[in-house]
Amino acid sequence: MASIVEGPLSKWTNVMKGWQYRWFVLDYNAGLLSYYTSKDKMMRGSRRGCVRLRGAVIGIDDEDDSTFTITVDQKTFHFQARDADEREKWIHALEETILRHTLQLQGLDSGFIPSVQDFDKKLTEADAYLQILIEQLKLFDDKLQNCKDDEQRKKVETLKDTTNSMVESIKHCIVLLQIAKDQSNAEQHADGIISTINPVDAIYQPSPLEPVISTMPSQTALPPEPAQLCKSEQRPSSLPVGPVLATLGHHQTPTPNSTGSGNSPPSSSLTPPSHVNLSPNTVPEFSYSSSEDEFYDADEFHQSGSSPKRLIDSSGSASVLTHSSSGNSLKRPDTTESLNSSMSNGTSDADLFDSHDDRDDDGEAGSVEEHKSVIMHLLSQVRLGMDLTKVVLPTFILERRSLLEMYADFFAHPDLFVSISDQKDPRDRMVQVVKWYLSAFHAGRRGSVAKKPYNPILGEIFQCHWTLPNDTEENAELVSEGPVPWVSKNSVTFVAEQVSHHPPISAFYAECFNKKIQFNAHIWTKSKFLGMSIGVHNIGQGCVSCLEYDEHYILTFPNGYGRSILTVPWVELGGECNINCSKTGYSANIVFHTKPFYGGKKHRITAEIFSPNDKKSFCSIEGEWNGIMYAKYATGENTVFVDTKKLPIIKKKVRKLEDQNEYESRSLWKDVTFNLKIRDIDAATEAKHRLEERQRAEARERKEKEIQWETRLFHEDGECWVYDEPLLKRLGAVKH
């Protein structure tokens, strides 16, 4: 990594309301990104502004491969590179700089200045761990003797060779560090200097002939026991890097002092670039611009009342979960329960223990602010674009329900869903499908603070039902072979199952027997770290089937984004989705628009509905998916299409905990949910950990016994997951 990186970028300015060319200089040692109106102005030292990188967070847009943001000092600066490769180079250099100075920030904020004695203590610890590793290495010989086949033996031998190489590297590092310590002691005693590692808070300017040790930080893995990080009083430190110059930009001419590489050690002939006029002594207290014309999202921090500052602790546990293979592993729910028993124990979201599902969790905004340091720790462990599937997440950010239960909220307006089959004309049915689809997302996000639902366990089940308005279930005929066998045939029933853990795939099914309509879907959630945001790609599809008309409407799902993760997180949807009916030829294109940083509204959608073989839509829709959407027809008619503010949410009904099977969502997660409800984060984390450990043990047992996992209610059909006993199949059996 070069200590000075420079090149052109465009920066958004509010004065011009657009992008303006600037020449940027990144000083790795100072932790400072300075910019100038031109390269000539840079050589004359006429700095336009600067961005302080200590404690900064980089963000990217998942739908734009050239722009990125830097959030620091309660401001968000927006930049644009020439292309994706250019952006990647800048982001890599910025991440390395931020990581270095964030680590320094920990030590400075704690008032701890590491001494040679601390360094020596760490060396002793490293040597002790090395001896343990060497002892463990001997176990490979026993493992090799027990190998049953050549393939297994080859894997163990490869692992042994890799471990041997790692041991030798560690030995070499310890020896070099010991030599460096001895040399440092000798030099400092000769000069009468107290033996301490100097904290780097100002711009480091070594002499041209000064030998420098490069300790460029690299990405670190999440610790297996994050709680230990809170207890440790030792803080990492790093030594400054020697002067090396690199220039970003394909059309720029390298300067005479450029080396083109940051990995090789600097030679004694290298000198700091003379044409870079940086502040001679200190890094500015805050990021600034001479005209303060940056575009920044100040209101993001205004909502929370503070800005990101400290990194002091960590909590959480891994989310690698598997299936419970206990005695309750029934293939289907018990269908012998009486209606009176089941319904007397039925509960809506507003009752007792489950009341948390229907209230806005506004009061929990404080918990996000309270645990901001944990989020900062997470940010320091991940890279932009990194898959978050296996990343440890702190317990406090969890929402008190499973992802499977969240999918049930697609049917918070079951009356709109069943009314699809009431339409007599295929055009009206397509319009009604779109209406139900656009109403399906807002109910899942009723709180003002976005949180993450539990990752479902392999084999986890969630089932519920809805009673339609103006309908009564008294003396009603039961749908005994349906997914929820204790409810009436006029209800909408729902069941979901986690059918795969790697990759994480959820399958869910809903139906209304009397209306002869069903819905089958599967979603593979793939999360990605975007800096100030987290993106979740919902890969998969759903199918609405109107059995009376033999019509099947195939639809896709938008992606989700968790924004402002350092302040008050909020959710938005983004991406283009489609709905198609192959039998009738009707189709719809729906676009969920993410909020652009240079203006615009949140939560916008636009949609077009097309007749068969028509390139021009007969209905255009626009508005907000969590607000009001308006429709404009080709006839000139304008009307409110969906008003989610006025649509009553019909509460789902779920059996009480004592009547649920062990593998049902609320039963599985009851201890975690209860402790989150009373805000006992430690107890919630412990409950989550116990659940995970049990599942891991059962997964190992299946592997040792070579037992394949069998799903409960769904099966794989090509690239889709299909419910075993859909209404279509059951009605077909009755006809025959």
UniProtKB/Swiss-Prot annotation:
It is found in: Late endosome membrane; Golgi apparatus, trans-Golgi network membrane. Interacts with OSBPL11 to function as lipid transfer proteins. Together they form a heterodimer that localizes at the ER-trans-Golgi membrane contact sites, and exchanges phosphatidylserine (1,2-diacyl-sn-glycero-3-phospho-L-serine, PS) for phosphatidylinositol-4-phosphate (1,2-diacyl-sn-glycero-3-phospho-(1D-myo-inositol 4-phosphate), PI(4)P) between the two organelles, a step that is critical for sphingomyelin synthesis in the Golgi complex. Pfam families: Oxysterol_BP, PH. One of its GO terms (biological process) is lipid transport. Residues 314-329, 336-348 have a biased composition (Polar residues). It comes from Mus musculus. The keyword Transit peptide does not apply. Heterodimer with OSBPL11. Interacts with OSBPL10. It catalyses: a 1,2-diacyl-sn-glycero-3-phospho-(1D-myo-inositol 4-phosphate)(out) + a 1,2-diacyl-sn-glycero-3-phospho-L-serine(in) = a 1,2-diacyl-sn-glycero-3-phospho-(1D-myo-inositol 4-phosphate)(in) + a 1,2-diacyl-sn-glycero-3-phospho-L-serine(out). Residues 209-368 are annotated as: Disordered. The modification Phosphoserine is found at residues 306, 324-326, 329, 611. This is Oxysterol-binding protein-related protein 9. The keyword Transport applies. It comes from the Eukaryota.
